[in-house]
């Protein structure tokens, strides 16, 4: 895949862990194994043989969500979606796993710096948490548990990956679930293109490390709405850059409609896929539109 990207003029950004782990690893303790960091480093050393011409590497995708999933193990009732947003909001990332994931990230970074010339970072999920009136202290607590502790691990990184979709209010009890609303996306998330700018500004102020938008997008069956969402997100990004936030690039999630949050229902893609037939791929208007935006570096986005 890396070679194919280069052959077609595509700059690959390689993520080494995106939620999926070997079964033997998961069944023998997974992230709670004492040697998790050493095993991850060994894996990274093995795959580094094909990363010599890769310029950008994300060690772990959304480590805070990985810690959330691990903490939810065995909790869902029969028939309950184990990765539903409502279940996620019931708790938070397992605090015992944050230092383990950080150690895995740092071990991988050491290997990659010794064996490649790539820029290295990781990509926590960002929720653009916002305090409701009088709940600033709870917001600080929630932000650190969900995101801040994972940003602590970015010291010495070349960049931080920003994964942004929506914003989440925080009241005295913690994150507030999104109520049903006609504007919600197909994942049930609030329609908040402004969340990207909130996250960019917040993380830049917190860390001062260059930022790469590794995921931003919307699950919708209305492609005009997709274009409107990305327009709003990029407008906020440009405003943040104008105020001094260093943003290295922007990646839309995702190229294809794919398996998302337990089903093929939420359609994030710029290209649709006929999964009931012959898997024909049909570009949506948003694909050409985003290509034009990229070609002029979003100059016509206000």
Language-model features, listed with the residues they occupy:
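Non-catalytic scaffold segments within catalytic domains of secreted glycoside hydrolases
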Residues: 1-302
